[in-house]
């Protein structure tokens, strides 16, 4: 009887072990990467995509042949100076940067090799990434201060991006409130998402002011990590 019981227990343990192995083998979640849902499940994991946004701010957005003119966020702020009144191009010269910064060469609007495409692609990529983080606000787990930090940073990034797009692709705010500005996206998008029409200058500034107010509220009292 003891031998029978012993063999029965060994067999039972073998079945349990085999069952566990089979469940492990059938696990579909990768062990060397995380899904977008997994990255946004808690505040600590969400620092990864947030860090990615900040890392991309000093990376080139252009093909290798044009990294001299689009080498990250600094190149866009330098370009903004050139398009303003602090620095004046008095003559076209050889043509370098003349039409590029005026944005009036239509053949270059859709080219990935020129600045207008870079600026548009850059800021809307940050907006898209921020929208994914913000969409997880109600489900993100973690200490309240940590969640507030991640969400607050995402609001700040989106506000800044819309501000720069408005500065670049629209006229000044005062006196032009009802004129076209840039499209507004506040929800995650994917390839094939129907594009939104251009919002007015007033609508874009209302959106970015709302975002920055939320960022200030959430980031108040949190430990700075960036």
Model regions and ranges:
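Short coil/linker segments at helix-helix boundaries
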Residues: 168-207
């Amino acid at each position: 009887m003891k031998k029978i019981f012993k063999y029965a227990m060994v067999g039972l343990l073998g079945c349990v072990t085999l069952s566990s192995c089979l469940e492990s083998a059938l696990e579909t979640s990768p062990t060397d990467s995380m899904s977008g849902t997994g990255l946004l499940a808690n505040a600590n994991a969400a620092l990864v995509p947030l860090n990615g946004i900040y890392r991309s701010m000093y990376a080139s957005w252009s093909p290798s042949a044009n990294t001299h003119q689009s080498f990250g966020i600094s190149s866009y702020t330098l370009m903004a100076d050139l398009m303003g009144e602090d620095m004046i191009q008095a003559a076209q010269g050889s043509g370098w940067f003349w039409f590029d910064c005026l944005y009036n060469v239509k053949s270059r609007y859709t080219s990935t090799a020129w600045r207008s495409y870079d600026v548009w692609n850059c800021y809307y990529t940050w907006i898209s990434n921020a929208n994914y983080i913000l969409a997880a606000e109600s489900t993100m787990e973690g200490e309240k201060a940590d969640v507030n930090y991640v969400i607050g940073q995402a609001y700040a990034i989106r506000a800044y991006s819309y501000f720069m797009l408005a500065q670049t692709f629209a006229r000044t705010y005062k006196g032009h409130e009802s004129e076209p500005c840039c499209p507004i996206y506040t929800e995650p998008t994917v390839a094939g998402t129907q594009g939104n029409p251009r919002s007015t200058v007033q609508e874009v500034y209302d959106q970015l002011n709302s975002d920055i107010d939320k960022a200030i509220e959430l980031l108040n009292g949190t430990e700075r990590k960036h």
